[in-house]
């Protein structure tokens, strides 16, 4: 064995490549070993250093891959054992054990986290060269007994199922120990680079290689100063020194110092020496030179997004200077926090990148499909799960529009559960859903699912066969092929599909002869899919590499950006969580000399020093270290390592907000520039110098020219909401000439509430989602129907009997039976409505001097000028003197207000009066009024009553009165009824004014509607708050920003309010 160490200013890779070349020139086969996370980059670096740029004699690989070169032909043809397969084996193991068999872990048998911890422990035991019987000295002896039972039974299952329990390194070591590879290894040289420690498994293999290979060469970075130190605790080279010292002591060899031809910039060397002096308690009498600072930058940004954008702009600048993407490395302090944001921002700046981390499969449509399938079975056909299966695009041959229609209907009819999905859809609504088509679609969905879900407990092999048959029926494989829209997606889908088939194969192999329920089968497959990961190789090598900062090696790239280096992430504090505590691992390690657990928390300090040292020397030309003040929406402090750099004299640059400028880094990329122009267009105006204004004027002129070529336009500012008028063609279709414009009192109210709301409801015909569950609209229909029946009953039966009959027959109508007998909640609503009917009905019994002459009367009121107003009058009453009036039932409190009417927000009663005047018989000229009847169950506060007497009854009936517009002429006839006439009496001339102004409101609205230009103008009564429908989700209206667009209502003081509004009405309607 040969041990080599060198200073950070030299290239260890070059030194080891030279050693490898010498061995290769002598005819030896050389394996150049790198850590798993660095083998790809190390291979490119090694091949670059070879003069011939490639050779068959030197193989750059990993320990595991190296073992396959020697054992691929002699290895037994056993099943491969991966993490998912291990989890299934442990699940089967726990199925065969009873809770009483496991005193410590019996309650965790079905816990997925516990199974994951068992998998991790089993892998750790293999890496540590330990067996479960070596787990002595645990806190509770019962733990070892339980673990022995579980793992021994699991290993028995592995043997029965012909799984290979040995790792590749164990198989390699066994072959060497048996002397099967002596001839090959005698002609082999092993070169090891990038390690600062070995696992027990690697350590054992290394001892065998040292005895059988021609030579083993190991290199590591250690300064000569550190190597000569006797006390190394806290030294930045502590990990490497322990590594070399342990090897030197074990193999009785002295490490040698070597140098490379390549010497890196002295600025990095001087920074390393300052860093070393800080931690070995020595002193230096010099500081960083001014030109050294050109190679380092310390950035501070407000949050992650700004930080990534500054990095992206800097990368674009490097490209402008002539460098390549492959010259740049981006390191992340927190991979999870940055992974979702860095991709879209780099795409915006058109920076190709490769994220050096396996992607989880959890977000793939196939995984979502499997999860929805499992949940559908477990939760009895829940609607959300069925729809998620369809939306994955992998179930059957349904268009998106068909799925949307199916979803709309199932939400309307509240279809959920197997019972409702299995029955034909019969309920319809005013929208007239295509029930025949929906039922055909329902059958295509239900039949294959029903066939699968009815599977009883049976052998796992049979369940897999039925699952595969189901997947064939729904054309899963064909649909999977149709998902991909790019070559990258094709590669991802192939990886996911391969993983899926591997999981099915493992399940069939392990549980084929075990009896399982379908729910357990689907849950196991789902768990395996959700925990699986895949990795896609970049299509080109010229990309920016992105990875976690703790995987970096010295001298990786010319330019390195390390971001997210906050106190919480730099240094990283690793704490192990599993079935064994660190204290238990330490006690086991004390007993076993060469077989040991890795205890991450015990090595945090020296590992973090080693990582910081590698990071500070990761670049060969320029190193940028950045820290956000807010990460994951949490404030964080500077890393202690960065504070040391500041003490060395490196300035901390506050990058601030990502303002646009006319620097090359801001304007060199068209896509990024366009996105930032849009961002500026949405912001408040900022102060600009004359030079800035001139520059951006020219840039905008150029951009608009380019956008016009692509038929694009810049969006308008959010703070100036405007709408475009409809085209002439659309106006002719929506409002054809010669056909009257149809309006109603409700439509007019919507128009004056917010014109854009009228456009949505009555031009685009957009409606809210319907539901079979009773709402205020259906409640109103029910109440109307009961009172209609009651008022039509002219028999001599007592009033209470009539009321009971009206309620009974209304409840028997098929529509109301479907609505109110569907569930307990609906039945409760019906009970409340019946109480309201019983409470309101007495008012009809009291008014014996009126006669109901018509109910639910449809009308069409010709307003002239091609306007037709339509509606339904709930009830037409006639007083004893022959005068007519209308009643409108309301489920909420309503009262006529002349100011609200003047502003167009309450035209209903006056419109009905106009309609009644038109349809009334010719011999009847007098109208006594139009009124609301609030259908309610009056609530009284008994605390306000001193005693229960007639005043209580009077208060109840006082709440049950007609409120609205009444004729002053009919005052005497109204005084004996339940009419609230105070401040509600109008003379005939005043009533005529109301009718004429009502016509004016319709004509004014119709004229505006026919122009086809609808404003976003919800009304405001005080100019401070907006009461109209703002439609924020559609219009993005904000009261504090867009108050100027709101329609201000005309308000007058209460004194002489009626007379003033009538005067205004006469003026505006030209009376």
Curated annotation (Swiss-Prot):
GO process terms (BP): double-strand break repair via homologous recombination
Enzyme nomenclature, EC number: 3.1.-.-
InterPro entries linked: ADDB_N, DNA_helicase_suRexB, P-loop_NTPase, PDDEXK-like_dom_sf, PDDEXK_AddAB-type, Restrct_endonuc-II-like
Pfam families: ADDB_N, PDDEXK_1
Gene3D superfamilies in alphabetical order: 3.90.320.10, P-loop containing nucleotide triphosphate hydrolases
Domain of life: Bacteria
UniProt keyword annotation of RNA-binding present: no
Cofactor requirements of the protein: Mg(2+)
Keywords: ATP-binding, DNA damage, DNA repair, DNA-binding, Exonuclease, Helicase, Hydrolase, Nuclease, Nucleotide-binding
Cited function: The heterodimer acts as both an ATP-dependent DNA helicase and an ATP-dependent, dual-direction single-stranded exonuclease. Recognizes the chi site generating a DNA molecule suitable for the initiation of homologous recombination. This subunit has 5' -> 3' nuclease activity but not helicase activity.
Self-association and partners: Heterodimer of AddA and RexB.
Alphabetized PANTHER family for the sequence: RECBCD ENZYME SUBUNIT RECC
HAMAP family registered for this protein in UniProt: AddB_type2
Family as reported in the entry's similarity comment: Belongs to the helicase family. AddB/RexB type 2 subfamily.
Note in the entry: Despite having helicase-like domains, this subunit does not have helicase activity.
Database matches in NCBIfam families: rexB_recomb (TIGR02774)
Protein name: ATP-dependent helicase/deoxyribonuclease subunit B
Species annotation: Streptococcus pyogenes serotype M4 (strain MGAS10750)
């Amino acid at each position: 064995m040969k041990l080599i160490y060198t200073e950070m200013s030299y290239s260890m890779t070059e030194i080891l490549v030279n050693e490898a070349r010498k061995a290769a020139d002598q005819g030896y086969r050389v394996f150049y070993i790198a850590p798993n996370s660095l083998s790809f980059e190390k291979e490119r670096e090694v091949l670059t250093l070879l003069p011939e740029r490639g050779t068959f004699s030197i193989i750059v690989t990993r320990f595991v891959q190296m073992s396959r070169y020697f054992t691929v032909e002699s290895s037994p043809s056993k099943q491969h054992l991966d993490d998912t397969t291990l989890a299934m084996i442990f699940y089967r193991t726990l199925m065969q054990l009873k809770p009483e068999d496991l005193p410590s872990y019996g309650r965790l048998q079905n816990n997925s986290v516990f199974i994951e911890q068992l998998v991790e422990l089993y892998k750790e035991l293999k890496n540590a060269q330990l067996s479960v019987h070596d787990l002595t000295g645990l806190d509770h002896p019962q733990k070892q007994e339980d673990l022995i039972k579980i793992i021994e039974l699991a290993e028995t299952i592995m043997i029965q199922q012909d799984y290979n329990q040995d790792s590749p390194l164990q198989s390699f070591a066994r072959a060497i120990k048996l002397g099967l590879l002596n001839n090959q290894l005698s002609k082999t040289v092993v070169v090891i680079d990038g390690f600062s420690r070995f696992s027990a498994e690697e350590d054992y293999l290394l001892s065998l290689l040292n005895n059988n290979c021609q030579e083993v060469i190991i290199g590591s970075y250690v300064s000569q100063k550190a190597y000569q130190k006797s006390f190394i605790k806290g030294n930045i080279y502590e990990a490497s020194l322990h590594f070399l010292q342990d090897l030197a002591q074990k193999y009785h060899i002295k490490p040698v110092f070597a140098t490379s031809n390549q010497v890196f910039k002295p600025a990095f060397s001087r920074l390393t020496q300052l860093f070393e002096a800080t931690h070995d308690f020595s002193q230096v009498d010099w500081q960083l030179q001014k030109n050294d600072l050109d190679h380092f930058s310390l950035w501070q940004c407000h949050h992650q997004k700004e930080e990534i954008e500054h990095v992206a702009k800097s990368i674009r600048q490097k490209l402008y200077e002539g460098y390549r993407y492959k010259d740049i490395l981006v390191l992340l302090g927190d991979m999870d926090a940055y992974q979702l944001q860095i991709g879209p921002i780099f795409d915006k700046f058109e920076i190709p990148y490769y994220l050096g981390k396996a992607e989880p499969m959890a977000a793939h449509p196939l995984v979502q499909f499997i999860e929805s399938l499992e949940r559908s079975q477990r939760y009895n056909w829940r609607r959300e799960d069925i729809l998620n299966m369809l939306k994955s695009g992998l179930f059957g041959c349904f268009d998106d529009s068909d799925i949307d229609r199916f979803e709309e209907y199932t939400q309307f009819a509240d279809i959920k559960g197997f019972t409702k999905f299995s029955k034909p859809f019969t309920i319809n609504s005013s929208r007239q859903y295509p029930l025949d088509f929906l039922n055909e679609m329902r059958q295509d969905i239900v039949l294959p699912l029903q066939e699968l879900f009815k599977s009883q407990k049976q052998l796992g092999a049979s369940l897999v066969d039925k699952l595969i048959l189901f997947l064939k029926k729904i054309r899963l494989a064909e649909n999977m092929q149709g998902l991909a829209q790019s070559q990258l997606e094709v590669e991802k889908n192939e990886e996911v599909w391969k993983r899926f088939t591997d999981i099915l194969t493992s399940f069939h192999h392990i549980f084929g002869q075990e009896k399982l329920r379908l729910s357990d089968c689907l849950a196991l497959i789902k768990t395996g899919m959700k925990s699986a990961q895949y990795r896609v190789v970049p299509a080109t090598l010229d990309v920016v590499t992105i990875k976690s900062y703790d995987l970096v090696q010295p001298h990786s790239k010319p330019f390195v950006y390390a971001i997210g280096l906050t106190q919480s992430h730099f240094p990283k504090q690793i704490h192990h969580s599993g079935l064994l505590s660190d204290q238990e691992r330490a006690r086991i390690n004390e007993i076993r000399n060469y077989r040991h657990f890795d205890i991450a928390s015990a090595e945090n300090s020296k590992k973090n020093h080693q990582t910081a040292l590698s990071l500070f020397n990761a670049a060969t030309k320029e190193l940028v270290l950045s820290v956000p003040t807010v990460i994951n929406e949490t404030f964080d402090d500077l890393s202690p390592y960065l504070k040391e750099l500041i003490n060395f004299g490196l300035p901390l640059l506050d990058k601030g907000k990502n303002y646009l400028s006319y620097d090359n880094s801001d304007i060199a990329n068209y896509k990024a520039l366009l996105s930032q122009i849009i961002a500026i267009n949405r912001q408040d105006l900022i102060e600009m110098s004359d030079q800035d204004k001139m520059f951006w004027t020219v840039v905008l002129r150029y951009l608009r020219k380019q956008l016009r070529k692509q038929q694009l336009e810049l969006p308008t500012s959010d703070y100036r909401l405007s709408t475009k008028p409809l085209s002439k063609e659309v106006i002719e279709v929506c409002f054809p000439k010669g056909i009257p414009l149809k309006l109603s009192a409700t439509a007019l109210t919507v128009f004056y509430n917010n014109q854009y709301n009228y456009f949505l409801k009555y031009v685009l015909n957009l409606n809210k989602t319907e539901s079979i569950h009773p709402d205020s609209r259906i409640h109103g229909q029910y109440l109307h129907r009961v009172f209609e029946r009651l008022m039509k009953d002219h028999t001599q039966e007592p009033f209470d009997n009539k009321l009971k009959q009206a309620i009974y027959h209304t409840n028997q109508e098929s529509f109301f039976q479907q609505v109110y007998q569907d569930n307990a909640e609906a039945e409760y609503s019906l009970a409340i409505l019946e109480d309201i009917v019983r409470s309101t009905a007495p008012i009809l019994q009291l008014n014996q001097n009126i006669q109901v002459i018509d109910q639910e009367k449809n009308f069409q009121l010709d307003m002239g000028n091609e306007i037709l107003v339509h509606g339904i009058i709930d009830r037409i009453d006639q007083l004893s003197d022959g005068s007519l009036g209308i009643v409108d039932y309301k489920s909420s409190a309503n009262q006529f207000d002349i100011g609200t009417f003047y502003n167009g927000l309450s035209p209903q009663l006056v419109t009905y009066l106009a309609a009644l005047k038109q349809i009334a018989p010719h011999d009847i000229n007098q109208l006594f009024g139009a009124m609301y009847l609030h259908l309610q169950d009056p609530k009284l506060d008994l605390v306000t009553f001193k005693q229960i007497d007639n005043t209580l009854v009077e208060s109840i009936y006082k709440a049950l009165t007609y409120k609205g517009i009444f004729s002053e002429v009919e005052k005497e006839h109204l005084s004996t009824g339940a009419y609230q006439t105070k401040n509600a009496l109008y003379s005939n001339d005043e009533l005529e004014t109301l009718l004429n102004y009502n016509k004016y409101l319709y004509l004014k609205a119709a004229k505006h509607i026919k122009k086809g230009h609808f404003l976003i103008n919800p009304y405001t009564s005080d100019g401070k708050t907006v009461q109209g429908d703002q439609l924020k989700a559609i219009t993005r209206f904000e009261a504090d920003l867009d108050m100027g667009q709101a329609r201000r209502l005309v308000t007058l003081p209460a004194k002489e309010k009626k007379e003033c509004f009538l005067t205004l009405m006469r003026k505006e309607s030209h009376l």
